[in-house]
Amino acid sequence: MKIVTTVQEMQHITKELRASGKSIGFVPTMGYLHEGHATLLRKAREENEIVVLSVFVNPLQFGPNEDLDRYPRDIDRDENVAKENGVDYLFYPSVEEMYPAEQTTTVEVVKRTDVLCGKQRPGHFAGVATVLMKLFNITLPTRAYFGMKDAQQVAVIEGFVADFNIPVIIVPVDIVREEDGLAKSSRNVYLSQEERKEAPHLYRSLCMAKERIEAGERNAEIITTLVKEYIETYTKGTVDYADLYAYPSLQVVDQIEGRIILAIAVKFENVRLIDNITLTVK
């Protein structure tokens, strides 16, 4: 595995690889890698001749009162996970390397961002789309891999790749969970011992809602109310949102039909956790 820290070198490598006909699987991350990231890397390894992993904590996608400075970082751990999962190139640029001067252009996302995390975090998805535009141009991937834990992000990325005719295949990958159902996340380290015991109830609330839908409930408000009440009963967390939308358009639905997403965000003392399920309802 080769570690690359400059845009120029990474671009030179990927241009040569693509010119020689090699397929490139790209996994963009902010580091502090866990089994969810490893799953993305293994899928990229299966489907491509070359695997590129980026580790970059992107300041553009953090708001003024968010956890940019304390976002967990451990490059030694990340290198080990990368090596264990078949990464060929680890792209690890500094902020100064990625943003050497003030940005004159950013990517503004105009759809699919006024709900869920986009509503709570204005500017977040503009930051995500801007850094991905840069990373796609640097790594020139054939395929790029994203976890469905950030399902809104996947919907936004699919839209922006289509809008700008970017020649990359977006590959969504199912959420990876702990044995008790908690979605794996770099931010889970912020949970207290008691909160960690409560956190699996987030996924249980979604499973309960899924059972109700499969049993015939089609009223979106009844389902989201059920989820909120369950989380408020079984955890000390504060429900930021529990919402149901058409997916991937993220349009409001009153009656549940077609492909939908049920998504939640819950604030604990030192961390905000998200989770979701997507399902197709006939």
From Swiss-Prot:
EC class of the enzyme, as a word: ligase
GO BP annotations listed: pantothenate biosynthetic process
Single GO term (MF): pantoate-beta-alanine ligase activity
Pathway in which the depicted protein is active: Cofactor biosynthesis; (R)-pantothenate biosynthesis; (R)-pantothenate from (R)-pantoate and beta-alanine: step 1/1
Domain of life: Bacteria
Entry keyword Cytoplasm: yes
Gene3D superfamilies per the UniProt record, alphabetical: HUPs, Pantoate-beta-alanine ligase, C-terminal domain
Reaction it catalyzes: (R)-pantoate + beta-alanine + ATP = (R)-pantothenate + AMP + diphosphate + H(+)
GO annotation, cellular component aspect: cytosol
Subcellular location: Cytoplasm
Alphabetical keyword list: ATP-binding, Cytoplasm, Ligase, Nucleotide-binding, Pantothenate biosynthesis
SUPFAM superfamilies named in the record: Nucleotidylyl transferase (SSF52374)
InterPro entries: Cyt_trans-like (IPR004821), Pantoate_ligase (IPR003721), Pantoate_ligase_C (IPR042176), Rossmann-like_a/b/a_fold (IPR014729)
Annotated binding of ATP, by residue: 30-37, 147-150, 176, 184-187
EC id: 6.3.2.1
Active site location: 37
Matching CDD domains: PanC
Residues involved in beta-alanine binding: 61
Pfam families cross-referenced by the UniProt entry: Pantoate_ligase
Binding residues for (R)-pantoate: 61, 153
Assembly behavior: Homodimer.
Note: The reaction proceeds by a bi uni uni bi ping pong mechanism.
Function according to Swiss-Prot or TrEMBL: Catalyzes the condensation of pantoate with beta-alanine in an ATP-dependent reaction via a pantoyl-adenylate intermediate.
Family listed: Belongs to the pantothenate synthetase family.
Protein name as it appears in the record: Pantothenate synthetase
This protein's encoding gene: panC
